[in-house]
Each structure stands twice: as C-alpha cells, then as structure tokens.
Amino acid sequence: MTDIDVRLREDVHVLGELLGETIRQQHGDAFLQKIEDIRHSAKADRRGPGEQLSSTLADLAEDDLLPVARAFNQFLNLANMAEQYQLIRRRDADQPEPFEARVLPELLARLKQAGHSNDALARQLAKLDIQLVLTAHPTEVARRTLIQKYDAIAGQLAAQDHRDLSPAERQQVRERLRRLIAEAWHTEEIRRTRPTPVDEAKWGFAVIEHSLWHAIPSHLRKVDKALLEATGLRLPLEAAPIRFASWMGGDRDGNPNVTAAVTREVLLLARWMAADLFLRDIDALAAELSMQQANDALRERVGDSAEPYRAVLKQLRDRLRATRAWAHSALASNQPAGAEVLVDNRDLIAPLELCYQSLHDCGMGVIAEGPLLDCLRRAVTFGLFLGRLDVRQDAARHRDALTEITDYLGLGRYADWDEEQRIGFLQAELKNRRPLLPAHFKPQADTAEVLATCREVAAAPAASLGSYVISMAGAASDVLAVQLLLKEAGLTRPMRVVPLFETLADLDNAGPVMQRLLGLPGYRAGLRGPQEVMIGYSDSAKDAGTTAAAWAQYRAQENLVRICAEHQVELLLFHGRGGTVGRGGGPAHAAILSQPPGSVAGRFRTTEQGEMIRFKFGLPGIAEQNLNLYLAAVLEATLLPPPPPQPAWRELMDQLAADGVKAYRSVVRENPDFVEYFRQSTPEQELGRLPLGSRPAKRRAGGIESLRAIPWIFGWTQTRLMLPAWLGWETALSNALARGQGELLAQMREQWPFFRTRIDMLEMVLAKADAQIAEAYDERLVQPHLLPLGAHLRDLLSQSCQVVLGLTGQPVLLAHSPETLEFISLRNTYLDPLHRLQAELLARSRSREAALDSPLEQALLVTVAGIAAGLRNTG
C-alpha cells in the first residue's frame, strides 16, 4: 500500500470518528453503539450466510429508522469527499505526477514522434472545439447546501496536509472539520420540494462560479506550458479549446415546467452572473494594474491618463455594471438594453487584450502573464453569457404545432401527410417571403408554447444560444419543421438545428435521414459551420440493451462520417451520454478514444449529467484533471485515430448485437411478469415521489416504454442488480464462445478500442453489482409467483461475471485494479446497511399509506440518497 493510500484511509478514519462524535452528542452512546453493531453485522454478513444484518434492521424502532439511514448516508458522502480530495492531493517531490497531469505532455511527445510538425500541433490544439453541455437530469441527489459543506471539508483536509502546522494550528483544523461535519449532520439531506428549472440553472451557474471559473485559466496555463515545451509555440489568446453549454432552462422535452418565460429568465440570469463574475475580476485587476507606461494603442484609447490601465478597466467596469443592472431589471420587466449594455463578446475581450499587449510592448510581460491573462482566458471561454443555452423539444410537438397551423389554413393535416408532402410544403414555405401565420391566429396552448419558445430564440443574442435539439427525430422533415417555425418567429441568422437519434431503429435510420436532408436543394447552402447530429445513448440502451445499442451508435457514427464527407460538409457529433454505463456513461478519456475513426475531427460535444457534474467538476482541481483528459483524448482521436475495425470483428459484432438484443428483449419486453417484477423489486415507484429534478419521471402513458431512462436505471442501481448495463451481454458472449470464437474475442479486446472499452465498462459495472443484495430486496418485497424471475435474472448476472472473467483471464473482476476493488469493498460495509434498510422501509411503506414527510418516508429517501452517493451514480 502506498503512502497515498495510507493518507486516504487516515482521512476517512478521522472523518468517520468526527461524525461518530457528532452522532453521540445528539443521540447518546447507546445509539452510536447501535450504528457500530449494524456496521459489524454488515461485515459479518459479507463473510457468512448474510442474515444477521436483516434481522438487526427488522428490529429497529420506528424512531431509529431515520437517524440510522442518515448516519450511513453521511459517512458515504464524507468518504466520497475524502476520495475526491485524494485525487488532487499535493504529491511529495519523489512521487510521480498523476496520469491526468502527464497525459497532454506525453501525448504531444508521441505525436511529434509520429511525424506531426510543431506548427501542425499548435494549430490543431488551438482550433479544438470541445463543448461540455451541463444538463439537469434528476440525478443529483445531494442538496447544494450540503455540497458546499462537503467542499469546505475538502478545503480543511488540504489545510491538514501542510507539514509545517503547529500543534495549535492542527487543532484548529480539527475543530473546523468537527464543526463542518456537525453542520452537515444537522442539515436535512433531502429537499422537501422539487427544484424548479430556474433552481437547476442556478445550480449550474454555481458550478461555474465556484469551480470552473478557477479551473479554466489554470488548465489553459498548463496547456500553454506543455505546448511551449513541446513545440516552442504558445496557445493563442483567442483559443478556447473547451467551452461550456447548458440544457438547464432550455430542455423542455417532457418537462412542461420549462416554458418560453423560463428560458428567457435563465438567459438573463446567465448575463447577470457573467457580468458579476467579470466585475470581480476587473476590480482585482484595477487594484494591480497601477502602472503608468503604455503603448500608443492604449494611449489612443485613454489619452494622457496617469494610470492608463485603470482608465481602460474603469470604462469596462462601467459597462459591466450597466449590463448587470439591466439584466436584473429585465427579469422583472421587458426593458430593452441600452447602448451601454454589453452584447458582443469582443467588447469584453478587446480592452483586456489592449492592456495585455501594452504591458508586453512596454517590457512588463511578467505582469501581463498574471491575473490579466487568466481574466482574458475566462473572457474567451465563458464570454458575456457564461456558455450557450441549448433548446430541446420533442419532434412530435413540432408536428402537432404544424398540424394545427395547416388545419387552420385549410391546407389539410400536416400529421397525415407522407414525408415527401411534408418536405415539399416545408421547403416552399422556407423560401416564401410572406408570413405563414395570420396575425389573428389563436393557437391551442401547446402550439402557443412552441411558437413562444421560437420567438425567444429569435430575440436572444446569437452568442447566448447553442443548438436547437429535436428529440425523437426520425425524418428530414423534422429538421425543416423547426427551421420553418424559427423563420416564422423572426429568426434571420443561422442556428444549428440538430436531430437527435435515440432508439435502435432511429440510429439505424440516421444515415438515410441525413443523406436525404443534405441532398435537399438549398439545405447545404444554409449551413453555417458544421452539420451537428446528436446520438442518444440512454433511450437506445433501454430500447435494445447495451450490446446492440453500443454497436448501433458506432455504426450510425460511421455512416454519418461517410455521408457528410460525400456531401463535403463538416460533421459535429453530439453525444447524449448519461452518468451510468446503462446510459452510455463511463470514463470520458477511454470513451473518446474508442469512437469510430474520423468521427472526432477536432470537434466533440457531449452532455455532462447530474451527479457526474459534481464528481467531475465540483472542485477546481478535479475539474482541471477532467478538462485535461477531455482535451488530450480529443486531440489524440483527431491526430491518431484508431484503424477501422477488421471485417471479421464487424461480423462478430453484428452477431453479438443480434444475440444481445434478442436476449434483452426476451426478458424486458416479452416476459409478461417483468414489469410487475421491476415495480415490486425496486424503489421505482417511490423514486417518482423523490423531489429530485424539475422533470416528471414518466412520459405521458404506457409501460416500460413510458419510463424515462433515468428512473429506469436508478431503480436497478438502488438494488445493485444493475440489469440495464449488462443484460444481453451474457448471452451474446456465451454464444460466441460456444461457436469457438474465443480467440477472435480476445483479439478484438486487445486491438479494437471500441470493444475493449465496452468490456472494461461491463467489468466495472459487474464489480459493483451484487446478487446477494438484489436477493434481499426480492425476499422482502416480491410476491412468491415472481421470485423465480428474480432468481433467473441473478443467474444471468452470474453468467455475465463468469463470461467476462473468461474473456479477461482474471481470477476476480477488476483484479487489474486493486485500488478500485478496495474502494468498492470499503463502501460495501456502509452500503449494505442502507440497502437492507431500504428494503425494510419499502416493505413497511407499501404495507400502509405513509405521509411524504413522515419519518419512514424521509428515511426511505435518505437511503436512496446514500446508495446513490455510495455507488457514485444514480441514473
């Protein structure tokens, strides 16, 4: 065990000890002993038959349910924070830098060895276009209040690490930790009400303010340093290889709470926040830049001022204050922006560049390269809007709106027309100079909302908006329909309208749809920049299982690369990944390097979801590491793409996908008991009551198809069966081995990044799965006639584990990563009581109608949050 591991264990021990002291102070020694007994029972059950813990928990008095659940939940959150801090802990001089810090310098060295010139490397790095899209899917269980306390705890762990602390200072740190842990313990874990879409957007702004605002300039300093050392060239000031966008306040797909008014409010809040953040920077810079000497360009701007830099910054500060004041007042009224309000990012960047260049010209480069450069990097990356807001809506809503319009105009029903009729109508109207809608048209509420959203898009500054994403897109007309509605709303500038292909059938049809669209007269001429296409991971996996979905996603991307090349159109692929393997999640670095050759051509757009935003970007140091990984992976996939898969690999993957989807659907769609079993064995129905996000957990009607991908995954994750992430693989891989294709599978795993990444992610999720825990839920919750189905699914889980072990040649899952295995083992001691307690609470809750704010229901919600924290993902 390394010294680093020892320090992590020490941190976890200290945090656990302080939590125990806090619990003792509120509940007494006897209760704390009860917690210890439960923990020891959990350990004993892992070694024995596994009945001690369940009987201990079944005997708990009603009043003990909530504090017991809270104790284990709090410990897992504290362990998470210790692990997160461990990732960014200062290394001693004799310890190697972490992979995340080395990845870019080592990649640049490899690229030079591969024959890339210094100029080519610098040029490609400067023009990288990586967009991380923050989304508010309801997977962030922890409250923002608690997250801030956990972040403060990380700060005290860092303070504790300083070697030169006096005993008194060390004691002060310990007292601060004790106080923060007490504050967390005495704070409710669960929101009493659902957040609004505006609350979610504010949470996104908080991630930028507290973490990304600091991480970006630090990350770009290191990129600049690595590039300079490798090539002798600098990263240009105008380069922003990574930018941010958001769906919070723009994603109205299935969420009636996201209205046109909400989108307008979120856009204004973003402008207010951006102005406020830049004002803080400018105030600090004005205090520093007191120098008198300036170049001619700056003097021309401010005359003979004794403090020319402060004079320039004062002008910018006045405009930022005017912008902030206007955004604040515009939230309450439709007040138009005055001339002083900043709208163009160049008006923010130019004064900063002027100061930077003047300082260099006057021999004060060391000052220019300080906080001024950091502010400039922020201005280029975040701009006046922090990031671009995407709009997303279901294709059916646009079809319904156009149907009402054509019906009103006496043209027939748009919904009843075939694809050629729709395209003919849409193209003719797009060319037509007259409005489509008469002024006196009074649409139904749903159509009125679609049109109002389009008007907000048309009215907003171009730089504040990203893409208009069409979910469940299935035809070229779906794209033209949005273009027509935007034209009707008064949009005169180009905007990316992005089809999202989600189901297995839609992914298979993505190529033909885009072939038709790009072949339409005038369509390509209207493109400004690349054609963006979104690939959906969540719904395709729920529809067909991850075996078939992963291959369909890969093939769809290959087809899109080929078709766009044929039409001489640049392609930007937008990856709609979730946080879990069942929704396309997994380590970003490996995922990017496993994309089809040519699909990452210097551009990459992906969603970052829910609790994964906190784990990957919640602390500046960790955010910086993840930004490094994204940048290095996109650069490598662009300049050193993997070779295309061999025909034999493709053929076997076709067969694996066919066997996988058949096995998956035979359980999920064809077994008449499956839906009932799912609802009884998991907390799926109770999750609908959890005030997680602003979006409803179900679509309007139906069975499994109506469930959104997130509660579908969330339910199985809570019981540790993890079914959506592996079901289908056990049959597909077993069949391949039975056909004597073991050597070919081994070759694919060794030589094909796509297949290796799939198997690695499968192994990770199987290591987190736990048949014993899943069985405990069945024993407590499932009616006798459904128990055989649960046993069958656990047999399939065991089969999955065995076939993966056979493929990897390891004695146990994750044998190659003992540290990860140790983390899982450590967490199980605290997760097991939460799982068993959750099953007990579900049984009690279902046997009687409990009020949402009763101790029983509150305890149930705390177990949900604790398990999500312990597994580091939810949906």
Curated annotation (Swiss-Prot):
Family: Belongs to the PEPCase type 1 family.
Key words of the record: Carbon dioxide fixation, Lyase, Magnesium
Job of this protein: Forms oxaloacetate, a four-carbon dicarboxylic acid source for the tricarboxylic acid cycle.
Catalytic activity, as annotated: oxaloacetate + phosphate = phosphoenolpyruvate + hydrogencarbonate
EC primary class: lyase
Reported cofactor(s): Mg(2+)
Cellular component terms per the entry's GO annotation: cytosol
Signal sequence coordinates: none
InterPro entries assigned: PEP_COase, PEP_COase_bac/pln-type, PEP_COase_Lys_AS, PEPCASE_His_AS, Pyrv/PenolPyrv_kinase-like_dom
PANTHER family named in the record: PHOSPHOENOLPYRUVATE CARBOXYLASE
GO biological process: carbon fixation; oxaloacetate metabolic process; tricarboxylic acid cycle
Pfam families: PEPcase
Protein name (Swiss-Prot/TrEMBL): Phosphoenolpyruvate carboxylase
Gene3D superfamilies for this protein: Phosphoenolpyruvate/pyruvate domain
MF terms in GO: magnesium ion binding; phosphoenolpyruvate carboxylase activity
The enzyme's E.C. designation: 4.1.1.31
Residue positions of the active site: H137, K542
